Every structure is written in structure tokens, then in C-alpha cells.
Amino acid sequence: MAKSNKRRPAPEKPVKTRKCVFCSKKGQDIDYKDTALLRTYISERGKIRARRVTGNCVQHQRDIAVAVKNAREVALLPFGSSTR
């Protein structure tokens, strides 16, 4: 008796779309000196979170990435995690 190779299709999960925080709040700027804001977009391992995770639009995700990299250069943010 051979097993059937037919697989059931996975149930579809509803896709939850997020709104960009910076597009909804027009007055909020992305600055490399605002480390409290930038830390929310960095993982515990020190990596910049992806756009699909944060829900930002393309332009604001680029601005966050540039600001994080600038903050790392001037030693406001660490390059990696402090624990190994």
C-alpha cells in the first residue's frame, strides 16, 4: 500500500496590513540622535528589523536604516549585541 502524495492546501491566513507610523504622523522626523526611536527598529541581536516586520513604507524604512547606520558610526548605537 503506497501512501497518497496528495497534500491538503494550507489554510489561508488573513494578511494584516500595517500602516507606516511616519506617514500617519506627519510631524515625526527620523533623526540619528533619537536613539529611543531607533532602538524600536533594532532586534535584540543588533540587526535592523525588516520592513514587513515593522510595517513601514519603503522611503521611511530607508531613512531608518540610514539613521541607524549613522548612529552606529558615532557610537550612539552598538553594531551588534553585547552578549555572546
Curated annotation (Swiss-Prot):
<keyword id="KW-0687">Ribonucleoprotein</keyword>
<dbReference type="GO" id="GO:0006412">
    <property type="term" value="P:translation"/>
</dbReference>
<dbReference type="GO" id="GO:0003735">
    <property type="term" value="F:structural constituent of ribosome"/>
</dbReference>
<dbReference type="Pfam" id="PF01084">
    <property type="entry name" value="Ribosomal_S18"/>
</dbReference>
<dbReference type="InterPro" id="IPR001648">
    <property type="entry name" value="Ribosomal_bS18"/>
</dbReference>
<keyword id="KW-0689">Ribosomal protein</keyword>
<dbReference type="InterPro" id="IPR018275">
    <property type="entry name" value="Ribosomal_bS18_CS"/>
</dbReference>
<dbReference type="InterPro" id="IPR036870">
    <property type="entry name" value="Ribosomal_bS18_sf"/>
</dbReference>
<dbReference type="GO" id="GO:0022627">
    <property type="term" value="C:cytosolic small ribosomal subunit"/>
</dbReference>
<keyword id="KW-0699">rRNA-binding</keyword>
<comment type="similarity">
    <text>Belongs to the bacterial ribosomal protein bS18 family.</text>
</comment>
<comment type="subunit">
    <text>Part of the 30S ribosomal subunit. Forms a tight heterodimer with protein bS6.</text>
</comment>
<comment type="function">
    <text>Binds as a heterodimer with protein bS6 to the central domain of the 16S rRNA, where it helps stabilize the platform of the 30S subunit.</text>
</comment>
<dbReference type="GO" id="GO:0070181">
    <property type="term" value="F:small ribosomal subunit rRNA binding"/>
</dbReference>
<keyword id="KW-0694">RNA-binding</keyword>
<protein>
    <recommendedName>
        <fullName>Small ribosomal subunit protein bS18</fullName>
    </recommendedName>
</protein>
